[in-house]
Amino acid sequence: MKNKGFGLAIAFVLALCPMFLGNFFPIIGSSVFALILGIVLNELVDLPENSRPGLNWSGKKLLQYSIIFMGFSLPIATVASTGLSSLKISLPTITVAFLAAIIFGKVFHLKSHLRTLIGFGTAICGGSAIAAAAPIIEADEEEIALSMSTIFFFNILAVFIFPVLGHIWHMSNFQFGLWSGTAINDTSSVVAAAFSYSKAAGEMATIVKLTRALMIVPVCLGLIGLKWYRSKQQGRNKGMLKKIIPWFIIWFIVASILSSIGLVPKVVLPYLKDLSHLFMAMALVGIGSKVSWKQFRAAGAAPLLVGLIAWFCVAGSSLILQMLFY
């Protein structure tokens, strides 16, 4: 850990700024600021070599630690008791998002990992879902940065567009809460959009969104199973299952269960949530520090187009399913 200290210190200090800005601009959020700051750092500053081990470690390990601590704010029992009724909307829209990202990702010649991350982020809970899936599929920093940037862009758009459309279509608080909870990616954006519509819509959307976020677990397990199956097909299955199962997903589940059964004092939960946000910001600074604007230009508009199509498919399917079920 000694050789990582300098880089970790840089990531920590730089992460404080995005977290501060995220409190003042919750629509954008600390994750966006952290990723941009990391990229700007890489572009404008010639980073010393002894900072690289710590920054690289932040981008990989702290990303996983942020997911573990996020588990404490997602108590499975509490969310499930109130949000199961929304699954008949959430599950089909999650499927639609994945299929749209995979199909159109192939059409626009996106790399396999990039289209998977865009689909995962659109389907479940934005940056947190991408952070959970990236280590499992062994995505690189460029793929993480491109997918997160795509998701963050549409999160910000949704905050402004969804309430306007809700009023134009005269949606009830229940309808808008269900729609925004199933069709907007990031939790902060869901909260911003839904509570701007009404308090009742905001409360409904939050429950739906948390229920949707819990799908991180089964979908990650599905990715693990797929990876194991492919390894088996290639004759590399000996000892692979142990290597494939990511320890941080196991600890995420443990954290959620501990929170559900009340073993974690309520007074501690806000601090654990803040720690998750800090680790995520530090991780994104580390990831951004290995990405350049040239890589974004080289990728072109394809990631945004795939993200846009997947987003439209999710929003549209959510509305159609509401008309069928309610």
Where are these regions (language model features)?
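Structural signature of multi-pass alpha-helical membrane transport proteins
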Residues: K2-G59, M70-T78, L221-F279, A283-G300, ...
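Transmembrane alpha-helices that form the ion-translocation and gating core
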Residues: K88-T122, F153-M171, A298, L305-Y326
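Membrane-embedded alpha-helical segments of transport systems
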Residues: S147-F162, T182-V191, I207-L221, W311-V314
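Oxyanion-binding "anion nests"
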Residues: Y197-K238
